[in-house]
Amino acid sequence: NMAVLVIDIPSNQVVAYCGNVHYNTKQEGNQVDIIQAPRSTGSVLKPFLYAAMLKEGSILPHTLLPDVPININGFTPENFNMQYEGAVPASEALARSLNIPSVNMLRKYGIAKFQKLLQQWGLRTLNRPATYYGLSLILGGGEATLWDVTNAYKRLVENIDPSMALRKSQAELQITGNVQGLEKKESF
């Protein structure tokens, strides 16, 4: 199954909406509008954790995070490639979507605190106790609708100068606006 939701940020209009590949066929699962159905979040929540920890000063982009085998009460997360990188800068861990640094960060930040932040950003389906999700929340252990996830990212994008990706150094970046729960400097 596949779904696509594209929103034009300036106009706040839905540009493309495809709830499933062949929505009207009789093939199993094709009658589900995946945009409105809660699905595993996978790794899409990682940027929100990084932003929250930047805001509180727990990490900086170049903070080294451990990417080594861990076992937390029987929970042994692994990276997608089943390899370990040792010490990795936070910005690289996020860019590469490394699981182990993210789990360690969530452990430090707090699951309940992170869940509350996600709810503030509009993820309405994360309504069970934080203990239900555990550390797997950051790896897809929770569910959200594509509407909610898209709107949360939209809030983030609305407050970042889109041309910053074309600039050469952080010193040249200009952040505009304010993200709910984040200051301008953290939303970068």
What label would you give each PLM region?
Residues 59-114, 158, 162, 177-188:
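Conserved catalytic neighborhood of penicillin-recognizing serine enzymes
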Residues 30-35, 86-87, 95-102, 131-138:
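Flexible glycine/proline-enriched surface loops and loop-helix/loop-strand junctions
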Residues 9, 24-25, 54-63, 124-127, ...:
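Secondary-structure transition/capping motifs at alpha-helix termini
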Residues 123-182:
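Active-site-proximal helix/loop microenvironment
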Residues 109-128:
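Short, charged, amphipathic alpha-helices and their helix-cap/turn boundaries
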Residues 12, 33-65, 93, 152-157:
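Active-site SXXK
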